[in-house]
Amino acid sequence: MKLAESMYAGPAHIGTLRVASSFRNVHAIMHAPLGDDYFNVMRSMLERERDFTPVTASIVDRHVLARGSQEKVVENIQRKDKEESPDLILLTPTCTSSILQEDLQNFVNRASETSTSDVLLADVNHYRVNELQAADRTLEQIVRFYIEKTRAKDPGSPDPGGAGRRQASSSTESGTEENLKGACGGEKTKKPSANILGMFTLGFHNQHDCRELKRLLAELDIEVNEVIPEGGLVSNLKNLPKAWFNIVPYREVGLMTAVYLEKEFGMPYTSTTPMGIIQTSAFIREMALMCHEVYNNSSTKCSQTDFESCLISNTKKVPKTYINKQTHFVSQAGWFARSIDCQNLTGQKTVVFGDATHAASMTKILVREMGIHVVCAGTYCKHDADWFREQVSGFCDQVLITDDHSQIGDIISQIEPAAIFGTQMERHIGK
């Protein structure tokens, strides 16, 4: 822990609360002292949604320190269960309350006995992970919880996980067909479909990105099966394996869930971010290959009409035709690259800094599609440093991995770039 004037990624409990408040009819209880309960105010101010933020703070005060937290935490869970009737109550400590070393799992077990809602403890090490890592872990934990719960209710259903593991060691046709079964005995959708994983509250332009992704999928005749967690219901998580593949737009949140679904159900996924003409083209080609693979291996074939109208009918011709049409007649990227606004930056020095996904994608767009010189590309996602270095290698002169805003400020002062592509922090530095 460190005292900082400002932070790029917050503490772990903020990530957990972002995931919980993104789902519909999920309530989070934060076991925290006064001062750690600012999430409600922050989200209400930034999102400006009609509904109240579904987070309750179970305050650690002097009485709790004297008698222990169990009675108060269990009482808060039971009270919210009666008042709100949520599908899920998620309990999370904070860095400060973790110091008490209390057995919160025992509190959850006790509260579960008298609650009609599901009660789950966020399994996150608050001293080792940041906001983004905690969000990724929490989303995977919730998905795992509900898929295993559905399996337990229907023990006679096929075990897609077992089929997936058998397929890894044996390529028999029966194993492949079992592996392509949907969740808990359900089958894949008739038409190609995808899950979008990782859209959640307080994300950077997540709503706009989700809208564009849905439009892209609709134009390719691919259905959207589920979007989680933003606006999703935990009761629908059992339907995730019915999709043909998963889309992870941002590496920071959703990647663990995609890996889990691939391991358990053999579901392919793409983590290519469709930013810029080149990466969007690669994204479309990946979807075409995944659709074709699932169609060839699936025991349930879609109709001939669906087959001929969608992406899977020809993995080379259909994507290429669509990409060429969008590039030459629809997209305005080429026009912007020739505009005076972009021409003024051609050959000029720039700095890019942000989360790993956006910083890497923006660096590639500036260099490959606009001819702009990126002197320094950096990210505050230190846990994903190796991937980031690999992505921006050859596109910039210098790579910076840090979560200290003063370091990026010093770099910007030394370089004196013509433009800065970064976070709100870099905006203040540039001024």
From Swiss-Prot:
Cofactors (names): [4Fe-4S] cluster
Q: What are the BP-aspect GO terms?
A: light-independent chlorophyll biosynthetic process; photosynthesis, dark reaction
Kindly report the protein's main subcellular placement as a broad class: plastid
Entry protein name: Light-independent protochlorophyllide reductase subunit B
Task: State its location(s).
Answer: Plastid, Chloroplast
How this chain assembles, per its entry, is: Protochlorophyllide reductase is composed of three subunits; ChlL, ChlN and ChlB. Forms a heterotetramer of two ChlB and two ChlN subunits.
What's the encoding gene here?
Answer: chlB
**Function, please?**
Component of the dark-operative protochlorophyllide reductase (DPOR) that uses Mg-ATP and reduced ferredoxin to reduce ring D of protochlorophyllide (Pchlide) to form chlorophyllide a (Chlide). This reaction is light-independent. The NB-protein (ChlN-ChlB) is the catalytic component of the complex.
Q: Which pathway does it serve?
A: Porphyrin-containing compound metabolism; chlorophyll biosynthesis (light-independent)
- Name the GO cellular-component terms: chloroplast
